[in-house]
């Protein structure tokens, strides 16, 4: 990929690719990034053990910044996860245990490390400073700098109240905690840039303002557009559920298929955001029409899957899509999965079959599916997926859960 030098306007590149919604000081930030390596942070509350494609825009933005020589920080909200960000939510989140939070932190860090190079000090937990600050101390350090009148004007809070949904004091204080996070990261790690979705604008502004009022460093904020697909669905979801970046939650094949099946209108935009192709090539692919646009969708699927799961997984998924589904569908409308008689004679099991075609991520995932009754041949549950398949499988329907069904076809 082409990486801009510090003398070039990195912000212009990010704007061209569609990463920028708002900046607290666009020209000041451009000059700050051009002046030398800066430290930027992206924060996640540890509400799940993986991230999904709705988070991918931030990961790619951080990747571009690191490629340009800047330092990434991953802030995990070990403390704020106990509260939950009320931004544009109608209800509070359930409270997690410490063990659940730690397991989620470990999972998020694994996903993050596939997109940026993490060092020993790249992962930060805000429990490091929030767990030790007393209530009265926090009010003195932070609370006195904020007006309730102004906080009530922020969209995230105002919309919640306008809908007459309850907003606890615990949640109301979240924005102050996030502002404090930014100031502490500036003080402890020299961090000067916070990244976030457009719904985080108020929280980011509060951090910038808090640093100014306390006489700290000049801080910057950059928000990304909140992504939705052209058919109106929130990015991160599919008809089958969340599109996770962790192979244990979603098989690489299904991840690849998500991108391959995207709306024609989204191809150019997604290539700019979720691949590292030069923009000239992005524009060429995005301008393709009709059947030729499928070429661009395959490029997108390969690029996104290679970043999330590695080149091998991307190739396996692409090969599976070509080999398994190349002949279209039978009268039933189900995809056809081909099996060679020679491979079957070698003792091929359902577990082997699903792994070889990258339809399931691991043997344990296949066994869990079978144990839950979700793996069936012509409607009959398969209790032991490791048993070699018999020759009578030709024409049978293989079901994985309630929504994924395939026809098996034997070939010489």
Curated annotation (Swiss-Prot):
Q: Which CDD domains match?
A: TyrRS_core
Q: Where in the cell is it found?
A: Cytoplasm
Q: Does the keyword RNA-binding apply?
A: yes
Q: Which GO terms describe its molecular function?
A: ATP binding; RNA binding; tyrosine-tRNA ligase activity
Provide the top EC class: ligase
**Predominant location category:** cytoplasm
Recite the UniProt keywords alphabetically: Aminoacyl-tRNA synthetase, ATP-binding, Cytoplasm, Ligase, Nucleotide-binding, Protein biosynthesis, RNA-binding
- Biological processes annotated in GO: tRNA aminoacylation; tyrosyl-tRNA aminoacylation
Q: Name one Pfam family in it.
A: tRNA-synt_1b
PROSITE patterns, alphabetized: S4 (PS50889)
Q: How does it assemble?
A: Homodimer.
Family, as annotated: Belongs to the class-I aminoacyl-tRNA synthetase family. TyrS type 1 subfamily.
Q: Briefly, what is this protein's role?
A: Catalyzes the attachment of tyrosine to tRNA(Tyr) in a two-step reaction: tyrosine is first activated by ATP to form Tyr-AMP and then transferred to the acceptor end of tRNA(Tyr).
Q: State the protein's name.
A: Tyrosine--tRNA ligase 1
């Amino acid at each position: 990929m082409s990486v801009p030098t510090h003398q070039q306007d990195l912000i212009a590149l990010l704007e061209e690719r569609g990463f920028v919604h708002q900046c607290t000081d666009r020209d000041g930030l451009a000059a700050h990034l051009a002046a030398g390596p800066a430290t930027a942070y992206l924060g996640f509350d540890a509400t799940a053990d993986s991230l999904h494609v709705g988070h991918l825009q931030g990961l790619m933005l951080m990747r571009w910044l690191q490629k340009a020589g800047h330092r990434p920080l991953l802030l995990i909200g070990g403390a704020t996860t106990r509260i939950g960000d009320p931004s544009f939510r109608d209800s509070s989140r359930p409270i997690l245990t410490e063990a659940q939070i730690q397991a989620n932190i470990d999972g998020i860090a694994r996903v993050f490390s596939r997109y940026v190079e993490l060092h020993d000090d790249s992962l930060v937990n805000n429990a490091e400073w929030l767990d030790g600050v007393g209530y009265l101390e926090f009010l003195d350090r932070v609370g006195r700098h904020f007006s309730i009148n102004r906080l009530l004007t922020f969209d995230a809070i105002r919309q919640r109240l306008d809908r007459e949904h309850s907003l606890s004091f615990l949640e109301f204080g979240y924005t102050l905690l996030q502002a404090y996070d930014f100031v502490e990261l500036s003080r402890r790690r020299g961090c000067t840039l916070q990244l976030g979705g457009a719904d985080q604008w108020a929280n980011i502004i509060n951090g910038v303002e808090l640093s100014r009022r306390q006489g700290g460093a000049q801080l910057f904020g950059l928000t990304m557009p909140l992504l939705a697909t052209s058919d109106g669905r929130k990015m991160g979801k599919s008809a089958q559920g969340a599109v996770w970046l962790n192979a244990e939650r979603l098989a690489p094949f299904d991840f690849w298929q998500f991108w391959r099946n995207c709306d024609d209108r989204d191809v150019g935009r997604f290539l700019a955001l979720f691949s590292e192709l030069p923009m000239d090539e992005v524009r060429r692919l995005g301008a393709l029409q009709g059947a030729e646009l499928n070429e661009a969708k395959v490029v997108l699927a390969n690029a996104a899957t290679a970043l999330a799961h590695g080149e091998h997984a991307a190739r396996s998924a692409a090969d599976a899509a070509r080999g398994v589904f190349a002949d279209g569908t039978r009268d039933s409308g189900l995809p056809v999965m081909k099996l060679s008689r020679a491979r079957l004679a070698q003792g091929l099991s359902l577990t082997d079959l699903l792994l070889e075609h990258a339809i399931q991520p691991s043997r344990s995932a296949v066994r869990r599916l079978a144990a839950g009754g979700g793996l069936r041949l012509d409607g009959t549950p398969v209790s032991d997926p490791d048993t070699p398949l018999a020759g009578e499988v030709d024409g049978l329907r293989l079901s994985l859960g309630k929504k994924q069904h395939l026809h098996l076809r034997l070939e010489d």
